[in-house]
Amino acid sequence: MYSLEISLRYSPFPLSIQKKDYEDVKRIYDEIKDFMQGKNTNSDLIEISCEKVQDKLITVLAKEVISVQIYEKSSVAGGSKRPGFSLDI
């Protein structure tokens, strides 16, 4: 299971969705990145859905997204990632 996490301006908590296939989450990641770079001007809204929670839909104002990341959710006990971005230095 892959998670896509979005951080919004002035919001302390990230929004996240889960997808089974890396290709699906990477496509959404690329779309959001295009919004952030101003390449996609067709809409001001980004709408995404979650495969883990079937009825979960998220719609955000594209100009409020400040960061996006993908990570693989581990099935090993204790392998869950805390919210936010991590630096491995």
Curated annotation (Swiss-Prot):
Put simply, this protein is called UPF0367 protein P9515_01381
Q: Which family does it belong to?
A: Belongs to the UPF0367 family.
Q: Which InterPro entries match?
A: UPF0367
Show the NCBIfam families listed in the entry: PRK13683.1 (NF010236)
